[in-house]
């Protein structure tokens, strides 16, 4: 277990981990299993609009995001958003779930995200994120997590 902030930052920069798991548990929307993940902690995003921001993804633990979108199980993380494709004729969400969200979900399922209390001391989180800007909900509604 990593117990100091510099070692954790080095592990993230080296690519030992792709990011940090912020939450694993039931959705506050419907109780289904979800995960919240923070990425791009030590490096800038390639997204010119967001730049150097920590990206957060809130998604189902048990169903790939593109599959959840097809079946309507995305409601666990998107609630009753009018941009969900289940609403026929509505403007569709701009998030391409088969791109970044699917990549994050696949990496999560391969164990590529550090888990507080397992891989590193959870007390390091405030120091790790100190001074960083966040894009809350790059995919998923933050209301789904406590």
Placement of each model-derived feature along the sequence:
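Class I S-adenosyl-L-methionine
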Residues: 1-146
